[in-house]
Amino acid sequence: MAGFGLPNFGQLTEAFKKAQEIQQNAQALQDELDGMEIEGKSSDGRASVWLSGNQQPLRVRLDPALLQEGQQASETATLEALQAAYEQSTATMKGRMEELTGGLNLNLPGMGG
């Protein structure tokens, strides 16, 4: 069947092995991200939000003095901290995914690899 532009059996077997390896590594990465605690802080440092590496909210801490300033100040600081935690969590997740799939070269003729 090589005349139809299909990869040979050896290449296909290797591709399946790599796919299985990626799947196993992806599960390990998922577990690793679940176990992470990524902190984001407001610009003044008086509000902190922690997310997992999978962006699940874990906890919030607000400085008592911030609460004395009222609802608007507390909401603004909390939002800043949440945005910072989200950006860090997203960057961490993206970086770890690139490490997982980086260097992936299936090299399959006729399959765009």
Curated annotation (Swiss-Prot):
GO molecular function: DNA binding
Pfam families with a match to the protein in the record: YbaB_DNA_bd (PF02575)
Keywords: Cytoplasm, DNA-binding
GO cellular component: a single term: cytosol
Principal location listed in the UniProt entry: cytoplasm
Subcellular location, record wording: Cytoplasm, Nucleoid
SUPFAM superfamilies tied to this protein: YbaB-like (SSF82607)
InterPro entries given in the database record: YbaB-like_sf, YbaB/EbfC
PANTHER family in the record: NUCLEOID-ASSOCIATED PROTEIN YBAB
Family stated for the protein in its record: Belongs to the YbaB/EbfC family.
SUBUNIT field: Homodimer.
Job of this protein: Binds to DNA and alters its conformation. May be involved in regulation of gene expression, nucleoid organization and DNA protection.
Protein name: Nucleoid-associated protein Syncc9605_0027
The organism of origin for this protein: Synechococcus sp. (strain CC9605)
